Amino acid sequence: MAESMKGLKRTCRCAEVTKADIGKKVTLMGWVQKSRNKGGIIFVDLRDRSGIMQIIFENGPISEEGFEKAAKLRSEFVIAVEGEVMARSGAVNENLATGEIEIRANSLRVLSESETPPFPIEENSKTREEVRLKYRYLDLRRPDLQKNLILRSKVAVLVRQFLADEGFLEIETPILNKSTPEGARDYLVPSRIHPGSFYALPQSPQIFKQLLMCSGYDRYFQIAKCFRDEDLRADRQPEFTQIDMELSFVDVDDVLDVNERLLQKMFALIDVDVPLPIPRMTWQEAMDRFGSDKPDTRFGMELNDVTEVVKNCGFGVFTGAIENGGSVRGINAV
């Protein structure tokens, strides 16, 4: 039976406890990752969004009733533990940020029991996607997905702070609007008040941000939800989020400068250094050098113009293209 957490206050998250806290009393709450009963001692790995902490239950520091409860713990039980931070008496676990310490429990409350989950709550799960989506609330407990959402949150905070420092105002624009010409089909929402009429969900805040420029708000941004009634593909999402901005009284170099510095700070969150200025090329230069308007410059596979070399070769495909004003280009694979 689930117990109440009344009277308990979590003091910190699992990975926030360090060697400097040895000897201190802490209260942790989270999910049981796994439990190992060694007879007179029970080891439990307690997990929350910050990481994992090893909890030790022994008769003496914890009551007999508490020890019996600990013996029944299973994966994904939600528990609250009070105890003392200790240096690990056994081998240090170098795979954990908390691998040098553990909590010797003196109190345990089972806040919620759990049935056996349909798949292991662990990183790099091999579970089929349809099963993971069916139990999405369990899938989102996995550390790799939690890291993604935590990083996304950090990026959003960074973007807001950076653009605020640059003089931008965060202004929300309407979601329910009339249909306007865009690059895809609109999602339509029927109106209850006006039967037979429909709202359109925005494919972008384009018109609204242009109106804001007319209204004197010379630097606007929002982290905007956008909707496009398209099939789901690798580069197409029916619902997506974008960093949307608009500036007045600037030229193209001003826009590029703001975005370059923002990208540099965003990539720094994942320890990737982006030297500035970012190399630039015109569309024509990209097509001439790489044959693409979105070239992958990592490999240096540039096109070489061999028109003069092959113009008299007698090969109809080449000579025909040259006679019509075209050129012959190829990649040097040597």
Residue locations for each model-derived region?
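Class II aminoacyl-tRNA synthetase catalytic cores and aaRS-like
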Residues: 1-334
